[in-house]
């Protein structure tokens, strides 16, 4: 690889590391139900929510369905995993299958990144409920239960579909103590 290409890659890497929005818009692909694999073009409200996530460690988003917020959380999780070593992300949802969908979205985005973004952070563990990179960062999925997240030190906690979790107060009391 010549020095000019290396320079461009280095500059792009720095831009991606500095901005999750830039990273997602430029390099993350998502699965659209009708169009298949497409580039993740964030809507303006998704950009605002992303800023909210970065500026407020405890964010609760009341929203309607099908706004792409789970996909946004997946992209944000992947950005954290790639550019911040040793981060532990936990996704709790009503059912394990729902939580697994978050990990699946992260994996899809990861698998479709250009090789230069993946070469330093290859998967060290990859199964249906976990993706751990060799930089120590990982995302794990679990179902909502009173002991969800116990014995974890969590950098980012995602509670997906929280309105549908029966014992959300008990789960929150348990899970919030895991936040590092």
Regions found by a protein language model. Name each.
Residues 2-180:
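Phosphate/NTP-binding elements of NTP-utilizing enzymes
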